[in-house]
Amino acid sequence: MSLFKARDWWSTILGDKEEFDQGCLCLANVDNSGNGQDKIIVGSFMGYLRIFSPHPAKTGDGAQAEDLLLEVDLRDPVLQVEVGKFVSGTEMLHLAVLHSRKLCVYSVSGTLGNVEHGNQCQMKLMYEHNLQRTACNMTYGSFGGVKGRDLICIQSMDGMLMVFEQESYAFGRFLPGFLLPGPLAYSSRTDSFLTVSSCQQVESYKYQVLAFATDADKRQETEQQKLGSGKRLVVDWTLNIGEQALDICIVSFNQSASSVFVLGERNFFCLKDNGQIRFMKKLDWSPSCFLPYCSVSEGTINTLIGNHNNMLHIYQDVTLKWATQLPHIPVAVRVGCLHDLKGVIVTLSDDGHLQCSYLGTDPSLFQAPNVQSRELNYDELDVEMKELQKIIKDVNKSQGVWPMTEREDDLNVSVVVSPNFDSVSQATDVEVGTDLVPSVTVKVTLQNRVILQKAKLSVYVQPPLELTCDQFTFEFMTPDLTRTVSFSVYLKRSYTPSELEGNAVVSYSRPTDRNPDGIPRVIQCKFRLPLKLICLPGQPSKTASHKITIDTNKSPVSLLSLFPGFASQSDDDQVNVMGFHFLGGARITVLASKTSQRYRIQSEQFEDLWLITNELILRLQEYFEKQGVKDFACSFSGSIPLQEYFELIDHHFELRINGEKLEELLSERAVQFRAIQRRLLARFKDKTPAPLQHLDTLLDGTYKQVIALADAVEENQGNLFQSFTRLKSATHLVILLIALWQKLSADQVAILEAAFLPLQEDTQELGWEETVDAAISHLLKTCLSKSSKEQALNLNSQLNIPKDTSQLKKHITLLCDRLSKGGRLCLSTDAAAPQTMVMPGGCTTIPESDLEERSVEQDSTELFTNHRHLTAETPRPEVSPLQGVSE
């Protein structure tokens, strides 16, 4: 609230139950009188137009009869009134009145009164335009730089700008991407129209661009605009303000500069005429109207802002200069010269309270209401407290809002995978080259403790693995029931899945006393499928393109003991070497060293190494656990194969780019196909037969192109899905090698998996490359940052498909480099602080320049040869196979 209230100079109440808005008030010398005094023009939604010329005998007097110069019923709602040079052949001011379906321009002339009734005004219609569309608002100005006259631009409710050159209609243009109309203003300095769209951004359109754009006599679709002649309407500049705008106004202080003022719902903006922000002021209250005006004496631009607290604030830039209290909420505010009094503030409320006031120091008569207090009765408070505590205890007992402990699970879920194949394979519609694809049965058992309704079981496995049934529904009408379902899993397509792990998820709702609909709960149980489901014994290979070596701290184990189900006829040869043949076609060889504690895995494809390597480590852990050995550990001392990993990333990214190009080309051909169809339809409907001019041939050719492109898009999507599966396999392998290389803990491995494997499914809108790049950049900025300077870098907030993969590959290389130099993966708040690390001798700094970064990308595989001396030799806790373990 303000200490002072606005000093009332003149006021009146307009009509009875009439409504007004910000466009209903205007101040101007509408009758072109010689003294230059402004008149108050007010229009209402009831269709009444009034013109006032206040002449109070003393300050604070109400309206007299002679103050009303004109009152006329126009019979149509008045949306906006403006005064300008709207009639050709003269530079006299005329009144423009905007109705919902009509624009009228009137000539207003004053008549001196010879009796006590005072002066009068007469209004004559000069011309009118009937509108084809429902109007919303209008603006005027010297469009195109014309001299001595004003043109009018009307914005319709469906987004069309209609320009009128005085008595004639010029043209109409639709705003692109229009949804809802916003405030409209004209800047004479830049010859542009400014509005605020429903996208919450300020948009500027050049008048010249509007004039030469494609005609909009009827709204055309985007595809027609592309194929038609003429230019498309292009926005000059935009600025996102993040909120809807109440009003927009342009003020020119001098000929060299102008400012665009925008009043938002919570902020007040001042922009340059090129869209750059001069300043912004956050408002602590809800504004209702505003008016920027030039202060010639101070050489600044001041702004009047009214709000819903009956206040009027005066700002000089962002500085509050004065605050005054009004008797009403203003919806429109103007400043003018009335009765030789300059700077009169005229405000209008939505219910017709019109007031002329000026600033002063009359004290506000507002008094705060007395606080109603009552004496406290402590006995009643004790009783109320006990009742509330009882309610809280009841809620805790009924588990209405609190999560239940693990001991009180409503449902137990267990999964058992059959050790043998199905006698009759359940595989159907397979695309694998082998004659017979095996299947294995999985049994899921559910046992309830309480009554549950509509428990839904969903089972998920990694593609190209397929389930015979993946959705089940149960009804547990009585406690302690046991339900068992069975389904089969098999390999559907001819490539290798990225994981052999499946997940069974049960969702249900448990009703309580306070929540009869039930509390939603989810229980999941993971299970592991056997390797032999996708793999057969194969012939070992002596040579291969890709090899990795796993070191252990125990003596080598016979491969026959680790993989008993993959032994062939010559068992003696398979003690130290064993071959595997995936159903998808890949061949992998595992060799156990006779003299050292090492195992080598080799294959022709890099991503095919993952499943066998992971299976080897898991079976080694199981073997030594059965032997009672607790200090078994695996490690990796070779170089991280980043170059092979980057090749898979590039191939996946190339398929994504190719998919975008194919979809864009398909969209263009579809537009062309529909355009030819319309031309043919017009020819067939024509009463006078005309030659088709090979339109039928063109239609047939375009149809074949659309079908071919659709097939190409479908084929590319299949290749992209397969490439993403291979990329996930390679990513799992790289994470495993980094974990063995740096002896990472289970929590640190989980952070790497969350960063490198954030998506279950890859799409064009949100792909693997941009998501992983954002996650790795966050790690480099926080827990792996070198200094506070790196922490201050702002990451891109939008996940867009990148131009190439160079930035992603550079970040992956830096991640490995910083891990090798003592970096610690952690998500705690203190991890973002710079850490002091004692570096061993011979360690170089991280390359930061462009040349160094290029060398890192080229020689990434040579950087990480052996960094075992950087970390202590502590055994890494490994996760046992997840065979039927519920969470």
Swiss-Prot record:
Residues 1-407 are annotated as: Seven-bladed beta-propeller. InterPro entries: PHTB1_GAE_dom, PHTB1_N_dom, PTHB1, PTHB1_CtH_dom, PTHB1_hp_dom, PTHB1_pf_dom. GO terms for cellular component: BBSome; centriolar satellite; ciliary basal body; ciliary membrane; ciliary transition zone; cilium; cytosol; membrane. It holds the Pfam family PTHB1_pf. Residues 850-887 are annotated as: Disordered. Residues 685-765 are annotated as: Interaction with LZTL1. Induction: Down-regulated by parathyroid hormone. It is found in: Cytoplasm, Cytoskeleton, Microtubule organizing center, Centrosome; Cell projection, Cilium membrane; Cytoplasm; Cytoplasm, Cytoskeleton, Microtubule organizing center, Centrosome, Centriolar satellite. Keywords: Bardet-Biedl syndrome, Cell membrane, Cell projection, Chromosomal rearrangement, Ciliopathy, Cilium, Cilium biogenesis/degradation, Cytoplasm, Cytoskeleton, Disease variant, Intellectual disability, Membrane, Obesity, Protein transport, Sensory transduction, Transport, Vision. GO terms for biological process: cilium assembly; fat cell differentiation; protein localization to cilium; protein transport; visual perception. Widely expressed. Expressed in adult heart, skeletal muscle, lung, liver, kidney, placenta and brain, and in fetal kidney, lung, liver and brain. The BBSome complex is thought to function as a coat complex required for sorting of specific membrane proteins to the primary cilia. The BBSome complex is required for ciliogenesis but is dispensable for centriolar satellite function. This ciliogenic function is mediated in part by the Rab8 GDP/GTP exchange factor, which localizes to the basal body and contacts the BBSome. Rab8(GTP) enters the primary cilium and promotes extension of the ciliary membrane. It is linked to A chromosomal aberration involving PTHB1 has been found in Wilms tumor. Translocation t(1;7)(q42;p15) with OBSCN. Part of BBSome complex, that contains BBS1, BBS2, BBS4, BBS5, BBS7, BBS8/TTC8, BBS9 and BBIP10. Interacts with LZTL1; the interaction mediates the association of LZTL1 with the BBsome complex and regulates BBSome ciliary trafficking. This is Protein PTHB1. It comes from Homo sapiens. The lineage of its organism: Eukaryota, Metazoa, Chordata, Craniata, Vertebrata.
